[in-house]
Amino acid sequence: MEGDTISRMMGSGVQMDGKILQTFEKSFVQVQNILDHNRLLINEINQNHESKIPDNLGRNVGLIRELNNNVRRVAHLYVDLSNNFSKSMEASSEGDSSEGRGNRRIRPA
């Protein structure tokens, strides 16, 4: 199902091989899992804060560190996704050019 979503996002004019789509899907699943975990962390942080119990407030320090590390991981995953997408588009356009679809017209000076 998620692969279908990625295919729809790519549009009908772009062809990508299954391995590339699997890589994108894997990255998106990783991001979603981290974001889901972050939601749980934020809820726990809020509950601890509202309780004002010293032990719970102390626990928030570690939870906030974990949250920050997770945000950093998501940012890195998105950078990797962006780089992989750019590389796949470059490879796709190079393939189009080598197949004769990239014919250029020479304009007079």
Swiss-Prot record:
Region (Disordered): 88-109
Coiled coil: none
Subunit field text: Homodimer.
Keyword line: Biological rhythms, Nucleus
Similarity section: Belongs to the EARLY FLOWERING 4 family.
Protein name: Protein ELF4-LIKE 3
GO molecular function: protein homodimerization activity
GO-annotated biological processes: positive regulation of circadian rhythm; rhythmic process
Record's keyword annotation contains Zinc-finger: no
Keyword flag Nucleus: yes
GO cellular component, one term: nucleus
Pfam families associated with the record: Elf4
InterPro entries noted in UniProt: EARLY_FLOWERING_4, EARLY_FLOWERING_4_dom
Transmembrane segments: none
Location within or outside the cell: Nucleus
Highest taxon of source: Eukaryota
Role played: Component of the central CCA1/LHY-TOC1 feedback loop in the circadian clock that promotes clock accuracy and is required for sustained rhythms in the absence of daily light/dark cycles.
